Amino acid sequence: MEFYKSKYTVNESPVYVSDNMTGKMAGVPAISTSVLCNTFCAARRASGDTVCAHCFAVSTMKRYTKANEHAEKNAALLMNRILAKELLPIFGNVRFVRIEAFGDVCNVTQAVNYAHIAKVNPGVIFGWWSKNIRIIARAFDQIGGKPENIILIESSEKVNVEKEPSSPYVDKVFTVYDKKFIKENAVEINCGARSCVSCQRCYTKGTEAKVHEILK
């Protein structure tokens, strides 16, 4: 078992933390698995009417093979067993962490591991994006509820179609719209910042429950 230490963590852990995110995610540490080994993601990409058909993570993981290697190792580690507390990453001077920047949760074991990571880092906000809310809800039920420092964001599966939260655990819904639909329906885009660090809308409770982004 390999151990890693991120510039954002105070300990070594077999869970790899991405600490060199770019674009709007610059400065945000992330714990991710790979879209390339996710059967849920593959099935949704095959359906042309989903936002997954436009997935940026596929090209990113294919281009950055080392990053994909770490993400696939995270998948194997997090999906197959509940990790002992001493194996979980402990974050230092960090305000928030992204869960799943390049994939999605696949099973309850993985979701429980993410919840445990949040529990051992009570001073950090974890923004968790997912389309597989049922899996996460089962994990939260199993551990006695959602940790208070997790903001669960349900991603709408289709472009231009905002879904309703599928669980009481969901804090926000994230929907992507194309420019034509935005213009014709006067959709307010409130995720347009060039920096998640400066915006923080998705990592702050009490802000808008519906987050809208332009399709890239």
Residue ranges and their predicted role:
Residues 1-216:
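Class I S-adenosyl-L-methionine
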